[in-house]
């Protein structure tokens, strides 16, 4: 599909010209009203207010300078982000600092990006201002409270260049396996990736349904930013937004919003589907119907097959179609979207021989009773944009052989901010002896392990997280899925080296149950036996140590991904407070 040199500001002006009175973004605030207070902006309002913010930013710096957005979830966040782009600045979307403690991640990102301004709101300006420090001799960033600007006064719109085809924003990675780095996302990347995802999710563009985007995802994360702000703009859709906290407090709100938004599309990580199943009652769904939900993307973290099944079964009585669930693979370095099953297909799984998988071969299980690992299909990706490559030789792997997923195309971003060496290593890979139809390069090395089997993409996990025990490869996501089917909570499977080899250690979050200390210990012993047996049976592995900890003990990133390297460090320093010390 062709990608033009259009920019996000040019699209925003086009929406304001062509659909001035159409609702663009609606934010539902459950904090001020448990039933939800809705506040909306039309496309003309979004455009005029973004221009006013851009005019204010012109006083702070020049196009190409960075502007950090540290605001609560809401319409002000949308306006701040689009205002930064309208001025030709490079936006840096971030979360507001954690209250009461120093937010090291916010400090590190601000030091790395060196913004000339910080866009925030009056409700959090006191916390945000503490981070507006000078770095490397540069002036401290100007703090602008977006909600205190006169955004409604009629005025002549300032003239801005609409041809900002370079960097649009820096998407700082969550850092599950390394220090966070700023991914440079261009205007072309955004438009190309949203367009690509629309083709992937709906097939024929002429058949793309009109409708509403529904999202509670944080606007500072790649999936939340693209889904909540960029996709509605590029695809001419209305957005219905709420805060992550509103979802976490009452997951049923997500399902209720999906049921009352007409034809709608949404997305969430795997854990959200699990929460919706467990914490949405029949009373919550009384009188509601999900037949108009055209798609719910499951992405951002490993998709558990059992969770998908539970979600479909739970909401089938409310007419949710199985074809609405869209397993998707992507990453910030490719803007967001890379692959998904074809439109109209229900989620498909294949059970692979586990012993063969540990040897790097994907062989579907037969009827011989071999132990299998069930993986979900991410569809048949375009061979010109996705290849499976041997990470050591840089030679493309044949079908059925596990390797690193490489990605090519207009959606691949510009690299890492101020990290030329890392950019060259990750973004400038070239295939050795490429097939006639394969581009030699540049290819993005995703760091993810996958395989093409029967033309479809299956994903195992991160290369850096791979567990090598007794000379065989084991995938921590698979082991964690086995544990979670028993315990229901978060689990981390890590490899801890001893004098000879690596040993499997499982860290499991578990809520203590029992009225007496004896009952608690009996339950913990039972869980340990059940988990140890399940891992041995499903993965042919011996657990060297199984650590039961309280919920919230496992280190995670801001997007909820397990920081396995931090788990290893904490375990080796005896930093986990074990529930099972007497077990």
From Swiss-Prot:
Q: Identify the CDD domains for this entry.
A: FAAL
Q: Which reaction does it catalyse?
A: holo-[(phenol)carboxyphthiodiolenone synthase] + a long-chain fatty acid + ATP = a long-chain fatty acyl-[(phenol)carboxyphthiodiolenone synthase] + AMP + diphosphate; eicosanoate + holo-[(phenol)carboxyphthiodiolenone synthase] + ATP = icosanoyl-[(phenol)carboxyphthiodiolenone synthase] + AMP + diphosphate; holo-[(phenol)carboxyphthiodiolenone synthase] + docosanoate + ATP = docosanoyl-[(phenol)carboxyphthiodiolenone synthase] + AMP + diphosphate; dodecanoate + ATP + H(+) = dodecanoyl-AMP + diphosphate
Q: In which pathway does it act?
A: Lipid metabolism; fatty acid biosynthesis
GO cellular component terms, A-Z: cytosol; plasma membrane
List, in alphabetical order, the GO biological process terms annotated in this UniProt record: Actinobacterium-type cell wall biogenesis; DIM/DIP cell wall layer assembly; fatty acid biosynthetic process; lipid biosynthetic process; phthiocerol biosynthetic process
What sort of enzyme, by top EC class, is this? ligase
UniProt-recorded Gene Ontology molecular function terms: acid-thiol ligase activity; adenylyltransferase activity; ATP binding; ligase activity
* EC id: 6.2.1.59
Its biotech or industrial use comes down to: Vaccination with the fadD26 mutant protects against progressive tuberculosis more efficiently than does Bacille Calmette-Guerin (BCG). It suggests that inactivation of DIM synthesis can increase the immunogenicity of live vaccines, and increase their ability to protect against tuberculosis, indicating that fadD26 mutant could be a potential vaccine candidate. A double unmarked sigE fadD26 mutant is more attenuated and more protective than BCG and is also a promising new prime TB vaccine candidate.
Question: Which keywords does the record carry?
Answer: ATP-binding, Fatty acid metabolism, Ligase, Lipid metabolism, Nucleotide-binding
Keyword match Lipid metabolism: yes
Q: What happens when the gene is disrupted?
A: Disruption of the gene abolishes the production of phthiocerol dimycocerosate (DIM) on the cell envelope. Mutant is attenuated in BALB/c mice. Mutant induces less pneumonia and larger delayed-type hypersensitivity (DTH) reactions. It also induces lower but progressive production of IFN-gamma, IL-4 and TNF-alpha.
Q: So what does this one do?
A: Catalyzes the activation of long-chain fatty acids as acyl-adenylates (acyl-AMP), which are then transferred to the multifunctional polyketide synthase PpsA for further chain extension. Catalyzes the adenylation of the long-chain fatty acids eicosanoate (C20) or docosanoate (C22), and potentially the very-long-chain fatty acid lignocerate (C24). Involved in the biosynthesis of phthiocerol dimycocerosate (DIM A) and phthiodiolone dimycocerosate (DIM B).
From the Swiss-Prot or TrEMBL record, give the protein name.
Answer: Long-chain-fatty-acid--AMP ligase FadD26
Task: Name the species this protein comes from.
Answer: Mycobacterium tuberculosis (strain ATCC 25618 / H37Rv)
Give me the gene this protein comes from. fadD26
